[in-house]
Every structure is written in structure tokens, then in C-alpha cells.
Amino acid sequence: MPSADARPAGRPRNPELDKAILAAAERQLGEAGYAGMSLDSIAAAAGTTVPAVRRRFRSKAEIVVAVIDSLRIQSIPAATGPLRERALALLRNFHANLLRRNSLAVVGSLLTEERRYPELLDAFRRRLVEPRRAALRQILIEGIDAGELPRGVDPEVLASMLIGSFYARYIATSDLPENWPDATLQQVWPAAA
């Protein structure tokens, strides 16, 4: 029986090919949607073969989940420092992630496919949306408890307003200005003078 330390047979995976496959899948998901992408087209765009893609991903849905995971270019900031600054760091982090090429198009594709493939949007919510909202909600709760935000403010509604403003701004103007995180937070949690 082989030892637990034994390497699997065969050549090690090429991390550059892994990146190329994910980039091709992300581009196709953003441009053609889930229904418009295929393992064949992903393999061709990545400069590889379908068997090479299948060795990494069992299905198109599994590739999309990997794309969703790759959309988080920056981790959620650590929970240290003044509360308002933590909220601002989280919103700036969200902004940076949204500005990544294809991020908003991928979100649009997932929304479009929700009726046929609800598990894809669910994966997006679980892996990206819920952790960020939970972190922001916690900061808002701490801000209310510390008296920095008014009592009676609903942290769930406020989190939706702050995060939702990014999507609303983009839909209305096709633009997310660099100062958007600062401008939105200033409306509900003014900086000390």
C-alpha cells in the first residue's frame, strides 16, 4: 500500500493552465452567459483540450463556482481599528472587487440564469455576498452599540443600502467612481470633523 506521502502518478498540474481555464470561463460567462458557454469553447479559449478541463472540473457548473471564487480578488479586511474605518475598508474592498473585469457581467449572467440554475446564484450568495454582508452588518451593529450610529437603525437595511448603492450606481451610469465607497458611507455615517 503506498504511503500517505506518495505523490500521485503523472505530471503535476500546470497552474498557468488552471488560470487560463478560469479566465476563459469567466470571460465566456460574462459575455455569453451560462447557457452560451461550453467545455469545448472554454478549452479552445484557454488553448487546451476538453479532457484537460475535465481533469480539473467535472462540469460546467463546477467551473462557474470556481469563477465565483476567483472573483474575490481581495479578502474581507480584518476586523480591527475604528468602526467607521472598518466599514470604509470593507466598502473599498467591495469596490475593488466589482471593478475587476467581467465581475458585474458575471453577476448579470447569474441573475439571468437564476430560474434554470438557481444553484449558481446560491453559490455566489454563499461564497461572496453573505460573508461580506455579515461582516458589514457586524460593524454596523457595533456602531449602533457604540453610539456612532443612531439607535433604531436597522443594520440589515443599512447594509443593503450601502452595498446596493454600488449596483444601482453602475446600472444608472455604467460607472463606479473611485470615491464611491467614501461618498456612500459619508451619507449614513459621517466622518468626525
Regions found by a protein language model. Name each.
Residues M1-A6, A89, N93-A96, I141-E142, ...:
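C-terminal peripheral helix-coil segments that are non-catalytic and often amphipathic
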Residues A123-L128, D145-S160, A172:
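All-alpha amphipathic helical-bundle segments outside canonical DNA-binding/catalytic cores
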Residues I21, G36, S59-V64, Q74-S75, ...:
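Short amphipathic alpha-helical segment with a characteristic S/N-K-E followed by hydrophobic residues
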Residues F57, I68:
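DNA major-groove recognition helix of helix-turn-helix
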Residues S75-V107, L158-A159:
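Hydrophobic alpha-helical connector segments
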Residues R101, A105-S109, E119-D145:
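Amphipathic alpha-helical packing segments from all-alpha helical-bundle domains
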Residues A24-A32, R86, L90-N93, V106-E113, ...:
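Solvent-exposed, amphipathic alpha-helical segments
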Residues M1-A32, G36-A45, P51, R58:
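Basic, helix-initiating cap at the start of DNA-binding domains
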